[in-house]
């Protein structure tokens, strides 16, 4: 049994969405918060939740739904990158569309939001049109979301393109937060109403989990994940007032609810929801079967997020306030960086050997393996060799890649490719192992052990190169680094 019951989730979540569609006369715009697939955050804090669980769940509704993908013109303009995949949002829109269509979902359109005539957005729209993808523009509305009189008018939502949809359920998704998904849904409600069509709105967000305690580590891990957005979990005051029951929401939903109340009243003549919690359809909290395991997984996620923030701050990508925001969560859930075993192991070896670059990995059986840089190998490359040798049952002292093979590679890197670091990176070590595996049984065994590294934890005492980061990401390894440059 896993801590999270994924089968139960898929069943009861799809049933609940069907009920909400029926509530609004068989037309529902469902704003999807977070990721529809590749939801690795959810799979880390809720062990047993699969990265594509939400997509699998929606497969139950596939014949009655279509997907609209949203991207902000501002994100196109600044080439915003999805950090977990290392690709820009505009590229991810095409990836998402292809993934959805490969799974049999209908994807008819892309909406470019926050549009105010940006040339980059126009060029992107033309590119999509050449690919046969219908594109719509939704414009920047002055005073949004608080200028309700303007928003709920022909000069507000009324000037947005009306998205042609054909199915009862319209799922509105995006590559990342801040894309304008809610505004797209509300704009559609306004324009459907103008055309005499009945339609409803609901919000499908996994986090925060409304029926877990406010300070539950699962909910605190969500705060860590959205620290750059300044999201803060809070008790839903509207739900408490309406029902006398506590439910967890977050600041942005509570802040915007009076605006939504006015918009819904303008569109419907009344607000069908009494609270932000009412708008949601999330059933995740009913599917947790081992709360202690989910709490521990969430605490580890907060530590990882803290290290990621330290690295981003060192690179100048975020403010120190974001780092401090995550740091304050440590006291709230009772953790420290020492609770990450690989961090302790790597730093202990660093101090013991007076080494600069040390890396440590925790394998699934609890074994901790460490490695440090040498004249031949970087610490990450050495760690990969040590870990796969252990998993393959090969003695630690066995040399898999002979020095006479490494040295010519180093010579090429420095003399011909104008590199400054002669040490082999993880990708170069894997290529060398692949070549040697044709005639060396041990090399073949180490390569075959690579899939066993998925989900393992690694910590480095220095910030790694992008090459090594990508290899760890592709192997499914959870990496953290001290904010120290080599």
Where are each of the predicted segments found?
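Flexible phosphate-sensing "switch/lid" loops adjacent to ATP/NTP-binding sites
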Residues: 1-172, 188-349, 353-356, 363-365, ...
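The conserved Walker
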Residues: 176-177
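Active-site pocket-lining segment
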Residues: 399-419
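Long C-terminal interaction/binding lobes of large macromolecular proteins
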Residues: 395
């Amino acid at each position: 049994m896993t801590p999270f019951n994924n089968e139960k989730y898929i069943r009861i979540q799809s049933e609940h969405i069907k009920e909400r569609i029926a509530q609004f006369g068989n037309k529902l715009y469902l704003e999807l918060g977070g990721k529809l697939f590749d939801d690795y955050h959810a799979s880390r804090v809720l062990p047993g939740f699969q990265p594509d669980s939400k997509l699998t769940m929606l497969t139950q509704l596939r014949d009655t739904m279509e997907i609209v993908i949203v991207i902000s013109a501002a994100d196109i303009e600044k080439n915003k990158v999805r950090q977990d995949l290392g690709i820009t949002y505009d590229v991810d829109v095409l990836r998402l569309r292809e993934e959805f269509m490969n799974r049999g979902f209908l994807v008819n359109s892309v909406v470019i939001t926050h549009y105010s005539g940006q040339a980059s957005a126009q060029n992107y729209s033309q590119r999509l049109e050449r690919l046969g993808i219908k594109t719509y523009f939704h414009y920047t509305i002055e005073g949004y979301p608080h200028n309700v009189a303007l928003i709920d008018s022909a000069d507000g939502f009324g000037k947005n393109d009306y998205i042609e949809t054909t199915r009862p359920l319209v799922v509105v998704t995006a590559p990342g937060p801040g894309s304008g998904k809610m505004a797209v849904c509300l704009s559609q409600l306004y324009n459907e109403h103008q055309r005499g069509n009945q339609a409803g709105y609901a919000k499908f967000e996994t986090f925060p989990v409304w029926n877990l305690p406010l300070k539950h580590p699962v909910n605190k891990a969500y705060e860590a994940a959205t620290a750059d957005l300044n999201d803060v979990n809070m008790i839903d005051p509207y739900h408490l007032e309406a029902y006398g029951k506590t439910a967890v929401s977050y600041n942005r939903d509570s802040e915007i609810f009076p605006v939504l109340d006015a918009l819904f009243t303008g569109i419907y003549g009344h607000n069908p929801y009494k609270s932000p919690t009412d708008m949601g359809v999330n059933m995740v909290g009913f599917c947790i079967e081992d709360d202690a395991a989910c709490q521990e997984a969430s605490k580890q996620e907060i530590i990882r997020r803290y290290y990621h923030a330290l690295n981003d701050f060192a690179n100048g990508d975020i403010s120190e306030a974001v780092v401090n925001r995550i740091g304050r969560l440590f006291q709230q859930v009772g953790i420290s960086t020492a609770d990450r075993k690989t961090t302790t192991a790597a730093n202990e070896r660093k101090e013991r050997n007076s080494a600069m670059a040390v890396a440590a990995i925790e394998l699934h059986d609890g074994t901790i393996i460490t490695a440090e840089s040498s004249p031949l190998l970087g610490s990450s490359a050495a760690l990969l060799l040590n870990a796969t040798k252990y998993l393959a049952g090969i003695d630690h002292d066995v040399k898999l890649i002979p020095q006479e093979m490494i040295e010519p590679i180093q010579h090429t890197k420095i003399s011909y490719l104008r590199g400054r670091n002669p040490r082999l990176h993880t990708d170069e070590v894997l290529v060398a192992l692949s070549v040697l595996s044709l005639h060396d049984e041990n090399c073949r065994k180490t390569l075959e052990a690579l899939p066993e590294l998925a989900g393992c934890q690694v910590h480095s005492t220095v910030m790694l190169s992008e090459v090594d980061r990508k290899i760890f990401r592709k192997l499914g390894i959870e990496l953290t680094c001290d904010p120290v440059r080599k």
